[in-house]
């Protein structure tokens, strides 16, 4: 599943941390898209172009269209090749394309943009870019669009992260144990239940993706890993686990609605000095002798 993240298109969110960096996985997915013949655009904001291209062979580098916003993010040099609106201008320009060739757009990084731009504006542009191939009237002329966004989750609060998460068709949360990297993949398909999967992997020196066997690779129903599970037995008003003595005491207890033979005899037997009552029935001509309700004319 990790090697087919871009098959569905849309926004793919790569959530990394200080312990488990995600740029290597981003470059591995970029290389895979380039080898598949897709147009690959890189919006480089966080590292230099030389650093990002390092490790790729010349064939891969020639297929990448790199937009450098690292050296001059505000376009102070007024270069002709720079987009006037910066990274957002580049994304908006890609919304106007009519090329049927599939396109992969890599944002390195989404955190850099989120720290400098309004969250609502960024989300609107990302939604427009990642859904342009599904717009009415454009499905026959515009190819599939995949947006890879590298997000440093620890730099942002739950609000912006939740907003980006709601836009993403696929979320990849990086983790691992004992030096082995893992990817928790949450995939949202149209008209289907979300599924999540954990895959173990490693990145080779040439940024090829090497999938490895892990303890759990089967797809499961979605459960958010960031929300702790709730124990339904925490706030009960009764004890679920009884000792042997408590169970015997419970079984010997007679509840108010349970009538034993002794209790029934005690209720029916008149006590000394207790007043007794009698029922008198005097039928008349208008009595309704209904066998199903024989007591409807009683005078007590």
UniProtKB/Swiss-Prot annotation:
UniProt keywords (A-Z) are: Cytoplasm, Nucleus, Phosphoprotein, tRNA processing
Instruction: Give the pathway.
Output: tRNA modification; 5-methoxycarbonylmethyl-2-thiouridine-tRNA biosynthesis
The protein's role, per its UniProt record: Component of the elongator complex which is required for multiple tRNA modifications, including mcm5U (5-methoxycarbonylmethyl uridine), mcm5s2U (5-methoxycarbonylmethyl-2-thiouridine), and ncm5U (5-carbamoylmethyl uridine). The elongator complex catalyzes formation of carboxymethyluridine in the wobble base at position 34 in tRNAs. Involved in cell migration.
Q: How is it modified after translation?
A: Tyrosine-phosphorylated.
Q: Name one GO biological process term.
A: positive regulation of cell migration
Composition-biased stretches, type Acidic residues, lie in 284-300
State if Phosphoprotein is listed as a keyword: yes
The protein's matches in InterPro entries, at most eight in alphabetical order, are given as: Elp5 (IPR019519)
> Could you tell me the gene encoding this protein?
ELP5
Tissue distribution: Ubiquitously expressed with high levels in heart, brain, liver, skeletal muscle and testis.
CDD domains attached to this UniProt entry: Elp5
The species is: Homo sapiens (Human)
The source's superkingdom equals Eukaryota
The chain residues annotated with the modification Phosphoserine are 252
Protein name in UniProt: Elongator complex protein 5
Subunit arrangement? Component of the elongator complex which consists of ELP1, ELP2, ELP3, ELP4, ELP5 and ELP6; in the complex, is required for optimal binding of ELP3 to ELP4.
Family the entry assigns:
Belongs to the ELP5 family.
Write down the PANTHER family for this protein, in alphabetical order. ELONGATOR COMPLEX PROTEIN 5
Subcellular compartments: Nucleus; Cytoplasm
Q: Which cysteines are joined by disulfide bonds?
A: none
The primary location reported for this protein is nucleus
Disordered, as annotated region: 264-300
Pfam families of this UniProt entry?
Answer: Elong_Iki1
């Amino acid at each position: 599943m990790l090697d087919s993240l871009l098959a569905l298109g849309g926004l793919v969110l790569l959530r990394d941390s200080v312990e488990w960096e995600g740029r290597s996985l981003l470059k591995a997915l970029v290389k895979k898209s380039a080898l598949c013949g897709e147009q690959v655009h890189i919006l480089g904001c966080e590292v230099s172009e030389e650093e990002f291209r390092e490790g790729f062979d010349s064939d891969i580098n020639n297929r990448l269209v790199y937009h450098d916003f690292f050296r001059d993010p505000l376009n102070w040099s007024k270069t002709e090749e720079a987009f006037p609106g910066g990274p957002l201008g580049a994304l908006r320009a890609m919304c106007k394309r009519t090329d049927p060739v599939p396109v992969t757009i890599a944002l390195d990084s989404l955190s850099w943009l989120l720290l400098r731009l309004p969250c609502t504006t960024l989300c609107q542009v990302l939604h427009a870019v990642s859904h342009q191939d599904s717009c009415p009237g454009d499905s026959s002329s515009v190819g599939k669009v995949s947006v890879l966004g590298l997000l440093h989750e620890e730099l942002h609060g739950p609000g912006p992260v939740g907003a980006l998460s709601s836009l993403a068709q696929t979320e990849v949360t990086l983790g691992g144990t004992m030096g082995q990297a893992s990817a928790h993949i949450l995939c949202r398909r149209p008209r289907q239940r979300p599924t999540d999967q954990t895959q173990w992997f490693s990145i080779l020196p040439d940024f090829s993706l090497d999938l490895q066997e892990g303890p759990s690779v089967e797809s499961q129903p979605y459960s958010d890993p960031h929300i702790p599970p709730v124990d339904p037995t925490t706030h009960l008003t009764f004890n679920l686990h009884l000792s042997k003595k408590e169970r015997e005491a419970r079984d010997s207890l007679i509840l108010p609605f349970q009538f034993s033979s002794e209790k029934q005899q005690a209720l029916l037997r008149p006590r000394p000095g207790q007043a007794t009552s009698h029922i008198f029935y005097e039928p008349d001509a208008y009595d309704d002798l209904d066998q199903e309700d024989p007591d409807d004319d009683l005078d007590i």
